């Protein structure tokens, strides 16, 4: 049997797809091929993600290729995957999670506190912008899109004092070797995006394919990301609004951190809970409902009007 993986052509996307392909080859001794596609999010680089549609920007073309039967599966950064799937496609697996926190890369400043007043920080994420301004209202947050290499080049050219990336991507591509300083934010400083660091394997809804993909599943990653995705789905939030949610398994307990608010950090709702591992089902939804009772929907509408 031969499996075809639909993939974006960026360096990180190719790494992720090749990583999954290798596991499938080693486990089942089958042929696995990669088929590259450009998504809307890869082409429209001049506008912030929030203004051109948020989630689905990096998945739609890959999903269409599967629906046309040109590919059997696609490997995504799970944080880019919408909560609901087109008919005929399913979330087949969530693989073992890489570090889920964010990090600051800089050529001249070793940590966040050493940044000078008014420092220029590159990130396109409204979630990061909100939390960075909450910590340091003096910073100038500038939209930064494009592939990872172009972002690093802009940092080296002194267009920015620092840029913010996910630690997962930094580790997968060894980006720490390309810059002078990497400062890892704690999850209390910067609450990550839902499913950050996890790979989501989307596939056609076919029993034989789903059976082959079972080997990619990681139980801990499934538990953590199910809480996070449930929270986002209940709030009906996506990339276009500033929401952070992270569930972290610590033995038989789970630490859940959540935040949402306005992009400028002037108004936020934030919470941190410890729950028993056995109580994870439905917790994302119940936490979201608590946020809604505190005015989360109104705050997110206000956030959308500010974009």
Swiss-Prot record:
InterPro entries noted in UniProt: HemC, Porphobilin_deaminase_cofac_BS, Porphobilin_deaminase_N, Porphobilinogen_deaminase_C, Porphobilinogen_deaminase_C_sf
Gene Ontology CC terms, in alphabetical order: cytoplasm
Domain of life of the native organism: Bacteria
EC identifiers of the protein: 2.5.1.61
Keywords (A to Z) from UniProt: Porphyrin biosynthesis, Transferase
Pathway(s) annotated for this protein in UniProt: Porphyrin-containing compound metabolism; protoporphyrin-IX biosynthesis; coproporphyrinogen-III from 5-aminolevulinate: step 2/4
SUPFAM superfamilies the record matches: Periplasmic binding protein-like II, Porphobilinogen deaminase (hydroxymethylbilane synthase), C-terminal domain
Cofactor(s) needed by this chain: dipyrromethane
Gene Ontology biological process: protoporphyrinogen IX biosynthetic process
One Pfam family named in its UniProt record: Porphobil_deamC
GO molecular function, a single term: hydroxymethylbilane synthase activity
Residues modified to S-(dipyrrolylmethanemethyl)cysteine: 239
Cofactor: binding details: Binds 1 dipyrromethane group covalently.
UniProt catalytic activity: 4 porphobilinogen + H2O = hydroxymethylbilane + 4 NH4(+)
Miscellaneous comment in the UniProt entry for this protein: The porphobilinogen subunits are added to the dipyrromethane group.
Similarity comment text for this entry: Belongs to the HMBS family.
UniProt cross-references to HAMAP family, sorted A to Z: Porphobil_deam
Role summary: Tetrapolymerization of the monopyrrole PBG into the hydroxymethylbilane pre-uroporphyrinogen in several discrete steps.
Quaternary state and interactors: Monomer.
Protein name per Swiss-Prot or TrEMBL: Porphobilinogen deaminase
Gene: hemC
């Amino acid at each position: 049997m031969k499996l075809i993986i639909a993939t974006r052509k960026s360096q990180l996307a190719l790494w992720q797809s090749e990583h999954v392909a290798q596991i499938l080859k080693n486990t089942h001794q089958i042929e696995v091929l990669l088929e590259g596609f450009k998504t809307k999010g890869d082409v429209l680089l001049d506008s912030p993600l929030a203004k051109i549609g948020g989630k689905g920007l990096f998945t739609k073309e890959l999903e269409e290729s599967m629906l046309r039967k040109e590919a059997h599966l696609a490997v995504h950064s799970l944080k880019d995957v919408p909560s609901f799937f087109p008919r005929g496609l399913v979330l087949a697996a969530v693989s073992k999670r890489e570090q889920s926190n964010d990090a600051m890369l800089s050529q001249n400043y070793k940590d966040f506190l050493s940044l000078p007043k008014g420092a220029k920080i590159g990130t396109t994420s409204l979630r990061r912008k909100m939390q960075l301004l909450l910590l340091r209202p003096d910073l100038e947050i500038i939209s930064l899109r494009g592939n990872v290499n172009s972002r690093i080049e802009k940092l080296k050219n002194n267009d920015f004092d620092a840029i913010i990336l996910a630690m997962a991507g930094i580790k997968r591509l060894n980006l720490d070797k390309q810059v002078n300083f990497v400062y890892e934010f704690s999850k209390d400083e910067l609450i990550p995006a839902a499913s950050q660091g996890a790979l989501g394997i989307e596939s056609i809804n076919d029993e034989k394919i789903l059976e082959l993909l079972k080997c990619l599943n990681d139980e801990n990653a499934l538990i953590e990301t199910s809480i996070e995705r449930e929270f986002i789905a209940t709030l009906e939030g996506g990339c276009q609004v500033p929401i952070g949610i992270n569930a972290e398994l610590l033995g038989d307990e789970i630490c859940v951190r959540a935040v949402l608010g306005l992009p400028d950090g002037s108004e936020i709702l934030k919470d941190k809970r410890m729950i028993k591992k056995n109580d994870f089902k439905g917790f994302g939804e119940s936490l979201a409902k608590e946020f809604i009772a505190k005015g989360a929907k109104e705050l997110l509408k206000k956030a959308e009007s500010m974009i």
